[in-house]
Amino acid sequence: MSAPAFKLRPYAPADEDAAIELWRRTWQLAYPRIDFSTRVDWWRQRWREELVPVATIMVAEADDMVVGFVTVDPTSFDLDQIVVAPEVQGKGVASALIAEAKRISPRGLDLHVNTDNERAIRFYEKEGFVISGGALNWRSGAPVHKMSWRPPAS
């Protein structure tokens, strides 16, 4: 069976419900002991107040469904969220979203990833990111790595 075809496009307000549900679903799979259904209202508020106003958001779409998205603030280099549906993970969607993030913010990208998320860390390293610091997530208190990508010097 071939990988589903997908396309990248700019976020539209009509994508909000699908993006937030995808965000919830992927985090629920990553952290099954936490009930993320109780956080949907908080995610929606954060989406509307913190991400949409400042970030460039690109959506991956397959069969008219949102299967991924990335949020990038090109003024601060911040890649806040990259979310990919489990059914298309490993099919190039995340790499395409990272490539798009690099296009949006060509001077560099920074992100934070939980230190126990080894799969994501390996993926980011494969995409050219390096661990550039560490901290505690100010919301959850979990330890995080700061990972950074900068373009090669010309």
What is each of the regions a protein language model found here?
Residues 85-91, 115-116:
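Active-site acidic-Proline motif in GNAT/NAT acetyltransferases
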Residues 104-116:
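Conserved GNAT acetyl-CoA-binding A-motif
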Residues 95-96, 116-133, 139-142:
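Conserved active-site alpha-helix within GNAT-family acetyltransferase domains
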Residues 10-87, 98-100, 104, 137:
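Acetyl-CoA-dependent GNAT
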Residues 55, 142-147:
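Short hydrophobic/aromatic beta-strand or adjacent loop that forms the aromatic wall/cage
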